[in-house]
Amino acid sequence: YLEFEILMDFVFSNRDRHLTNISVLRDADSLKFISLAPIYDSGKSMMVGRDIVPLTDKYVLSQEAKGFKDNEIELLKYVQNRNLVDINKLPKVDYIKEMYLKDSQTSEERIKFVCEMYERKVDMLDKFASGADLRAIRNP
């Protein structure tokens, strides 16, 4: 479960994963445990609160994280099954853009930044799943 969570946090640039924001799903009537919640407390995702900057591989792979480790690259060290996330099932960037366009408060520049970051993260996840050492990409 935590490996999946780490990979999803990487794709969505969630930088606030710690033990108090991992949750479970329970049956509403019996309160019986169903499973761990696949995505929970992801409010600090998708570059929220981040400055819009030119995107480089180094920037994409240098995102800070709070909680278990200080950055995403360090968290990825805990992932043994690199193929847990089926990239083909992730939302397409057009869908991400469509959702952001519904918010009149979000600038076109911010939407472009978020979408480009998301595309690069999906690409990096694909490389990671294929065995690439992302630290080598970040620090050539």
Predicted features along the sequence, with ranges:
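Anionic ligand-binding catalytic core segments
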Residues: 1-14, 19, 23-140
